[in-house]
Amino acid sequence: MDQKLYLSVDCGFDKFKCCIGDYLLAFSSKMIDVTNSINALSVADGDNTYIEYKGSVYMFGDSIDQIISMKSNLKMYAEELDSNRNKQRFKDRTFHISLLAAIGYSIVAYDTVYNPEKDVDKHLFRNLSNLQYFIGIGLPYGSMNEWPQIKEFLKQRHNFKIRRGSKSCTFDFDLDLSNANFLCNAQVITAFLFQGASSDGNLTIDKKALPCIMMDAGYKTVGLFELAKNLSINPETAFSDTDHAMYNIDKYVEEKVKDAGREDFSYLQVQYHARGEGNPAVRKNTTVINVKDIYEKVLAEEAIKLCSLLEGKYSLDDVENMFITGCTGIAYYPHIKKYMAEHHGLTKVVLTNRADDGSEISPMYAIVIGLHKQLKNRYK
C-alpha cells in the first residue's frame, strides 16, 4: 500500500511556511529568474537554492535577501521581486513554479535535515511514485478565488530539478500529482484552527475564550475575523486589510531613509537591514542612517493606527480574546498588547505560540500547523 504523505504550505508574501509529516520549515518566498545569470552556472553557490523547470532556472529562498542588498543586483531584479509581493502574484506562472519549488524543497529538506535516513533508498525522494499525496495550501482570505487555477497547475505530472549550492547537489524530480488530494483554506481561518483545534483537527476551543478576534498579520495583508460563542463567523467581520501590513511599514521606512539621503534605498532592502542578518545601518558619504531604528519607530506608529482600525470595526470590550499570529503579528504583538491593556483592559491579547503539547513554537507557523491539522482530519 502506498505511503501517505501529508504536506502543507502557507503561501506568505514574505515566506513559505511548510509542514511535511511533523517537520516545519520556512524560507523566503521570493524567486528570481537567473537563467541567463552567472549565478545559475556557478559551481560553488553556498546555500543558494534553485529550481530548474522547463528550460528556465530560478533562484529562491533566503539567500536572495543578501543578493538584493547590493545596488546593482537590486536594479536588475527589482521589478521581478516587486511582482512577487503583489496580490496578483497568485495568478502568475512564477508563483505556480515557486509553489512547486516549495513542495520539492520540503521533500529534500525532510530527507536531508529532519530525517537523514542512512539508507537513501528509504528517502521520500527515492519513493515519489510510491507516495499517496495529501497537499494543503493556505492563501490570503482575499485571494481564495485564485485556488482553481493554482490547483489546475499543481494537479499534473511535474518534471523539475531542485539544486542546493553546487550542481553536484541536484535532485531530479518526477512528481506526479495528478491523483493527489488537495485542500485549500484561508490563512486566517487555519490560524484559528492552530489555536482552537486538536492535533487531529477537531475543534477543542474553550467556549469561555469566545467571542474572539483572530488576527493574521502578514507581509501584504492583515487578515481579521470575529468568532462568536456559537463558533459562527459573521462575514461582515471578516476582511483583509492592506493598509497596515509589513509591506506598508517597509514602504514608509523607504521614504524616511530616502529623505535622510539614501535616494537609491528600496523597501525590498528593509528586511535585510532591519529584520535580517544585515548591518542595521546604511551610509551616505559620512552620514550613517540607522534603518533598524527607523523601522522600530514606524512599526510602533502603525500598530497604533491598526488598533484604531480595530476599534472602528469591532467592539473590543465585548470580546474575551484577541489571538494574534503571523510574522508581522509577532512584531505588532507587544505594541497591541500595551494599547489594549490601556484602553480595553479586560480583553486578553494572546500570541499564538503554544503547540498542542504546551511547548513554545513560533507564531509564524500557526497557519501551516492549523492547515495541516485540517488536512489530516479531512483525509484520515
Name every feature range the model reports, one short phrase each.
Residues 1-212, 232-233, 242, 291-295, ...:
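Nucleotide/phosphate-binding catalytic cleft detector across ATP-hydrolyzing
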Residues 36-39, 188-192, 219, 225-269, ...:
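Glycine-rich phosphate-binding loop plus the immediately following alpha-helix
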Residues 10, 17-19, 24-28, 237-251, ...:
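A composition-driven signal for long, intrinsically disordered, charge-rich low-complexity tracts
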Residues 16-20, 222-227:
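Short beta-strand scaffold segments in enzyme catalytic cores
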